[in-house]
């Protein structure tokens, strides 16, 4: 009580950007398929692991300002340019956009739980509108829900730990580290 929903959401976002944390981000699309992304952050380093289904998993490590795309199957890491988006944007893709858009405080039922939420309407390039809701459970930003014509997409944030194993940010010693150009050349030879 006391703080508005908007203030509490902004506080939750600020905490997430600065904190050391290990979280699972689970995205459930309208057909019920769920995809899990692991995101960890500590000391300015970031680790992101995305489950790509049959293609295995994709790991991205940002360490000491250098980005690496790690492929466990081939034991290779491709050293790339660090994308211009900041780490916090990667981990919380659309979260900053709610600021300038008229928002409504609502209650959204997510997975059978009523959550206080801040909702706004977004229009995509094709003119389709969707309602995006930032949902709090207590003071924690737990879900970002998008309700669109094709159904509901739920992104759930599960912070599993506030301490991060620093080994996550290390590329295993037996992995080959290549530049993007070297990697492309190696692919061309196969």
Region locations from a protein language model:
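Short, hydrophobic/aromatic-rich segments at coil-to-beta transitions
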Residues: 16-25, 42-49, 111-119, 138-144
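Short, solvent-exposed secondary-structure boundary motifs
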Residues: 25-33, 45-54, 89-99, 121-128
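Edge beta-strand at a domain terminus
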Residues: 64, 148-185
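A structural detector for beta-sheet-dominated domains
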Residues: 24-28, 49-51, 63, 106, ...
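Extended beta-strand-rich segments in extracellular/periplasmic secretory proteins, especially
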Residues: 90-147, 175-178, 182-183
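An acidic-aromatic
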Residues: 34-92, 140-159
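N-terminal leader/targeting segments and the immediate start of mature chains
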Residues: 1-45, 107, 167-190
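Short small/polar-residue motifs
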Residues: 7-8, 32-37, 55-57, 95-106, ...
């Amino acid at each position: 009580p006391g703080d508005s929903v908007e203030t509490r959401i902004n506080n939750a976002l600020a905490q997430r950007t600065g904190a050391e944390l290990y979280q699972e981000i689970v995205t459930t699309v309208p057909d019920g398929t769920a995809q899990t992304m692991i995101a960890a952050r500590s000391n300015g380093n970031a680790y992101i692991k995305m489950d790509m289904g049959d293609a295995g998993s994709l790991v991205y490590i940002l360490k000491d300002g250098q980005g690496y795309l790690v492929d466990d199957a081939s034991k290779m890491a491709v050293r790339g340019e660090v994308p211009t988006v900041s780490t916090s944007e990667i981990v919380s893709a659309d979260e900053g956009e709610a600021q300038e858009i008229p928002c409504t405080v609502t209650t959204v039922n997510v997975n059978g739980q009523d959550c206080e939420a801040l909702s706004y309407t977004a229009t995509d390039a094709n003119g389709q509108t969707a309602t995006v809701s930032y949902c709090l459970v207590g003071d924690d930003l737990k879900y970002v829900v998008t309700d669109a014509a094709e159904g509901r997409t739920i992104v759930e944030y599960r912070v599993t730990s506030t301490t991060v194993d620093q080994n996550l940010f290390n590329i295993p010693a037996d992995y080959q580290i290549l530049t993007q150009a070297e990697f492309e050349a190696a692919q061309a030879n196969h």
